[in-house]
């Protein structure tokens, strides 16, 4: 195995909530796109940002954050269901 110091992602929903999905015009590809702003993402989850002359986001590396966010939402939903039984 090559992974070490493995830790569960905590407070995924809080992190997701700090991000804003945007639409924008990409001057390089000359097309309208949707995504996130790398500078904003870097403040919340710097591990997924490629820092260079042009910043970029490794969107595939964000899947684990989204998975944990969904799990947190499911726990909240189950808690609400229990209250209404």
What would you call each of these model-derived segments?
Residues 1-60, 76-84:
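C-terminal intramolecular chaperone/autoprocessing and neck/assembly modules of extracellular spikes
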Residues 66-71, 76:
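Extended amphipathic alpha-helical segments enriched in small hydrophobics
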């Amino acid at each position: 195995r090559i992974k070490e110091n493995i830790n569960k992602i905590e407070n995924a929903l809080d992190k997701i909530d700090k991000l804003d999905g945007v639409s924008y015009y990409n001057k390089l590809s000359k097309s309208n796109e949707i995504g996130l702003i790398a500078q904003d993402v870097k403040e919340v989850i710097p591990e997924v940002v490629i820092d260079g002359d042009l910043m970029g986001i490794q969107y595939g590396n964000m899947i684990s954050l989204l998975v944990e966010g969904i799990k947190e939402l499911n726990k909240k939903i189950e808690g609400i269901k229990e209250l209404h039984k």
